[in-house]
Swiss-Prot record:
Belongs to the phosphoglycerate mutase family. BPG-dependent PGAM subfamily. CDD domains: HP_PGM_like. It comes from the Bacteria. InterPro entries: His_Pase_superF_clade-1, His_PPase_superfam, PG/BPGM_mutase_AS, Phosphogly_mut1. GO terms for molecular function: phosphoglycerate mutase activity. It comes from Chlamydia pneumoniae (Chlamydophila pneumoniae). SUPFAM superfamilies: Phosphoglycerate mutase-like. Substrate binds at residues 8-15, 21-22, 58, 111-114, 122, 138-139, 182-183. HAMAP family: PGAM_GpmA. One of its GO terms (biological process) is glycolytic process. This is 2,3-bisphosphoglycerate-dependent phosphoglycerate mutase. Pathway: Carbohydrate degradation; glycolysis; pyruvate from D-glyceraldehyde 3-phosphate: step 3/5. The lineage of its organism: Bacteria, Pseudomonadati, Chlamydiota, Chlamydiia, Chlamydiales.
Length: 228
């Protein structure tokens, strides 16, 4: 059996201001920092062998802060994709390498790209375009905001990345911690739980609250201790 821990990043500065963030690289707010520490305490006794985050700083901050509480005391280190950076950051101490946890970053796990809504206030946007249209942009499965992505579009990048990079880790018995975003995680959970296009629309993931699945009997299922 292996664990899959999914965590939406803590509150960002733009979450706090009720702005659309998308791919804009916004850090955590003070509350978000506290949420990351709290999430870390919730998973501190769970085994973790590798970490995956998006390329956005709020995702990375959440993972790093959460891991400060981990019982293993192991240090996350970023595994660079660029060959030169990977070689330049090589660890030559086997002892220290054993005390570290690899962390992989990919834009495939980034938040849904909100296009022309990015940086705009959510309430004011609803007043400008109408609540129904904005609700359609935000909550429908295949309708995207101007120049942005729908949840369907987001899934076209998150799911292939999951199947190529994360699923094999679980199949090899590795425990995986994924720190990402509301919509990138919703798109994955849609597949994990076999949710319909209608069912996924009501799926809400609060900031800083981990959800745990397990790889068991050749399939991913909800962990009974965390889903009750």
């Amino acid at each position: 059996m292996a664990l899959l821990i999914l965590l939406r990043h803590g509150q960002s500065v733009w979450n706090e201001k009720n702005l659309f963030s998308g791919w804009v690289d916004i850090p955590l707010s003070q509350q978000g920092i506290e949420e990351a520490f709290s999430a870390g305490r919730a998973i501190q006794n769970l085994p973790i062998d590798c970490i995956f985050t998006s390329t956005l700083v709020r995702s990375l901050m959440t993972a790093l802060l959460a891991m400060t509480n981990h019982h293993s005391k192991k240090i996350p280190y970023i595994v660079h994709e660029d060959p030169k950076a990977k070689e330049m950051s090589r660890i030559y101490s086997a002892e220290e390498e054993n005390n570290m946890i690899p962390l992989y970053q990919s834009s495939a796990l980034n938040e849904r790209m909100y296009g022309e809504l990015q940086g705009k206030n959510k309430k004011q946007t609803a007043e400008q375009f109408g609540e129904e249209r904005v609700k359609l942009w935000r909550r429908s499965y295949k309708t995207a905001p101007p120049q942005g992505e729908s949840l369907y579009d987001t899934k076209q990048r998150t799911l292939p990345y999951f199947e190529k990079n994360i699923l094999p880790q679980l199949q090899n018995g590795k425990n995986v911690f994924v720190s990402a975003h509301g919509n990138s995680l919703r798109s994955l959970i849609m597949d994990l739980e076999k949710l319909s296009e209608e069912e996924v629309l009501s799926l809400e993931l609060p900031t800083g609250k981990p959800v745990v699945y397990q790889w068991k009997n050749h399939k991913i299922e909800k962990h009974p201790e965390f889903f009750g």
